[in-house]
Amino acid sequence: MSDLTELTAEDKANVLVEALPWLQKWHGALVVLKYGGNAMVDEDLKRAFAEDVVFLRTAGLRPVVVHGGGPQISTMLDRLQIPSEFRGGLRVTTPEAMDVVRMVLTGQVGRELVGLLNAHGPLAVGLSGEDAGLLRATRRHAVVDGEPVDVGLVGDVVGVDPRAVVDLLAAGRIPVISTIAPEVDADGNPLHGQVLNVNADTAASAIAVALEAQKFVVMTDVAGLYRDWPNRDSLVREITAGDLAALLPSLESGMVPKMEACLRAVRGGVPRATVIDGRQAHSVLLEVFTTSGNGTMVVP
């Protein structure tokens, strides 16, 4: 039954009863959600995701949302007629493009999600990796044909100061974090106020580790991890960190950063990390509060 209105009163009660042990298990748990994929561009899925996050908070969990915004950045660059290209899987980010990245992530994607969440009450607060020194990053290069290639203002997260997020959680808020980060040198000192565009999957993983999250969830546009894509019978429901590390070299390129993020989270102390299908409405609730779960879970 796909529509809740089709359920009988007894069916609805059974749904709630099934959720009870999971409500008990996860009460008070800190959960980091990486928001992305089709759930960021489909209006119905946006609203469903916001409802899921508010449900988590109302049920006593402590959700933290981390987001990127690749499609929205590309759309704005095209609209402003700013050239954009990818090299070695990374967006070449010029200073002009970085202004757009900053504007779109913090001023558009983040604000929209905060608005959707706050439609249910004054709960969400938006911030970026720049705020209160939340993220620190160093510049990285792409690798093309085995050679390093300069891709401009693109970085890797090398440090997280979670205190601002902890304060927001203590105040009962839902932090919504956009993934840009101040550039630092090898000693961690800021470099001339420059900011870098960082991968949202890896940033979310680093934030989950720094917050000592009990759960890390990454939204994708597939049902989970497949051992032999596109063979849909090869969907993996659960995998250990060791087995995932061995499987990474054979994965489709689009899944690599997401599975690497899960691997880093689990190896960093997060008890479980899950990749879920963001194309399915309320996929977060299905993962957290049902016995069958959703997607692929990575465990130590």
UniProtKB/Swiss-Prot annotation:
Its EC number is 2.7.2.8. InterPro entries: AceGlu_kinase-like_sf, AcgluKinase_fam, ArgB, Asp/Glu/Uridylate_kinase, Glu/AcGlu_kinase, NAGK-C. One of its GO terms (cellular component) is cytoplasm. Pathway: Amino-acid biosynthesis; L-arginine biosynthesis; N(2)-acetyl-L-ornithine from L-glutamate: step 2/4. It comes from the Bacteria. One of its GO terms (biological process) is arginine biosynthetic process via ornithine. One of its GO terms (molecular function) is ATP binding. It is found in: Cytoplasm. It is an enzyme of class 2 (transferase). It holds the Pfam family AA_kinase. Substrate binds at residues 69-70, 91, 197. Coiled coil: none annotated. CDD domains: AAK_NAGK-C. SUPFAM superfamilies: Carbamate kinase-like. The keyword Secreted does not apply. The record marks 34, 258 as: Transition state stabilizer. It catalyses: N-acetyl-L-glutamate + ATP = N-acetyl-L-glutamyl 5-phosphate + ADP. Keywords: Amino-acid biosynthesis, Arginine biosynthesis, ATP-binding, Cytoplasm, Kinase, Nucleotide-binding, Transferase. Disulfide bonds: none annotated. HAMAP family: ArgB. NCBIfam families: argB. Catalyzes the ATP-dependent phosphorylation of N-acetyl-L-glutamate. Belongs to the acetylglutamate kinase family. ArgB subfamily. This is Acetylglutamate kinase. The gene is argB.
